[in-house]
């Protein structure tokens, strides 16, 4: 009797190999839960969720799991602010105090106004701090929040305070809470489940816990859902929402960054004008009459990442506790990427966490798919 031939081992498909690659990278970094989504020319070509939503590892992450995405909040939020600036024809060199109706002044340079352009390029002379205050008027009389040696527009310092002012300006201009404005004008039109607190998400069924660098709980999703949230228009007291409080999924993040890559339109829905996005990518020193003289890593809440295959990427990164988040687009290739990693210790190379850089390099394989 003839010996039966061994059953051939199936050759892994390209998607299986990609899934294995993504899982290996997350596992190698000891990530508890994360996701990566890649699009080209506005169309999602690949998405993969990995791991778990919480420290107890009893719920799997999906591409629709909403994470608190830290400073990527700033780029998402500035989309709403730039809409209002477009609609009203506001000059970016307008003093912020003229928009919000309260003082935004460096006490060491009281005669030099802090402008919208300076805030969005992180050249406002506000310093970095993770300590938030009761209201903006309190902040303006406290010198420690401002540089004592560099006037507004003359030096780059990344500051969460700048991000917080985005929300104050949105609320002052729209007369709505930043959450309501963004729901009606950005998230809703793009079909995105996102909110500045999970209790006001449209779909509250898929939320990740906040984890530390060792994968333990900072705040469980169930505890977060017991918090109250003031969803009113109060620009003077809402100080930190647009600096890092947004909850959104990888599927939602890719729609934001793909919209920017596509010149402000996605699936037939226009959010911003193409010239606005070009301005957001630009070195603000080069604008005639600009209130920014300092070299900055940011245009208008958009950073450049150079030195990777395929050309320059544009976008933003977030880091908080054990989470990193990244959204970038690459104009030369039409690629966009969203990466979330939670419950691990992030390491960076040239200002971008290594796990995101790895996936940005791997994304080049999608240029011809």
Q: Model features per residue range: what roles?
A:
Residues 12-67, 89, 137-147:
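Short, conserved catalytic-motif segment at the N-terminal edge
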Residues 1-13:
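Ser/Thr-rich, Proline-interspersed low-complexity disordered segments
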């Amino acid at each position: 009797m003839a010996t039966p031939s061994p059953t051939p081992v199936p050759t892994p498909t390209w998607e299986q190999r990609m899934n294995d690659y993504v899982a290996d990278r997350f596992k190698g970094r000891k990530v508890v839960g994360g996701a990566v989504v890649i699009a080209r020319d506005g169309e999602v070509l690949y998405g993969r969720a990995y791991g778990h939503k919480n420290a107890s590892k009893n719920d799997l992450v999906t591409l629709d799991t909403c994470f608190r995405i830290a400073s990527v909040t700033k780029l998402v939020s500035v989309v709403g602010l730039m809409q209002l600036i477009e609609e009203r024809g506001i000059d970016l060199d307008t003093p912020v105090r003229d928009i919000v109706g309260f003082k935004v002044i460096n006490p060491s340079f009281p005669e030099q106004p802090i402008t919208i352009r300076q805030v969005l390029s992180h050249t406002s002379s506000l310093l970095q701090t993770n300590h938030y205050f009761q209201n903006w008027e309190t902040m303006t009389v406290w010198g420690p929040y401002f540089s004592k040696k560099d006037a507004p527009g003359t030096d780059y310092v990344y500051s969460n305070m700048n991000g917080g002012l985005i929300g104050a300006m949105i609320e002052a201009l729209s007369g709505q809470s930043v959450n309501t404005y963004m729901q009606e004008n950005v998230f809703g039109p793009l079909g995105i489940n996102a909110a500045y607190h999970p209790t006001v998400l449209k779909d509250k069924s898929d939320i990740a816990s906040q984890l530390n660098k060792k994968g333990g709980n900072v705040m469980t999703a169930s505890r977060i859902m017991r918090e109250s949230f003031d969803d009113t228009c109060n620009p003077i007291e809402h100080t930190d929402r647009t600096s890092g409080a947004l909850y959104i999924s990888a599927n939602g993040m890719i729609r934001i960054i793909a919209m920017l890559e596509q010149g402000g339109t996605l699936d037939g829905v226009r959010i911003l004008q193409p010239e606005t996005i070009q301005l957001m990518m630009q070195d603000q020193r080069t604008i005639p009459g600009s209130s920014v003289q300092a070299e900055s890593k940011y245009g208008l809440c958009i950073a450049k990442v150079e030195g990777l295959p395929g050309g320059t990427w544009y976008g933003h990164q977030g880091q908080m506790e054990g989470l990193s988040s990244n959204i970038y687009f690459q104009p030369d290739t039409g690629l966009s990427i969203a990466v979330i990693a939670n419950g691990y210790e992030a390491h960076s190379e040239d200002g971008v966490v290594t796990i995101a850089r790895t996936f940005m390099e791997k994304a080049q394989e999608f240029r011809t798919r």
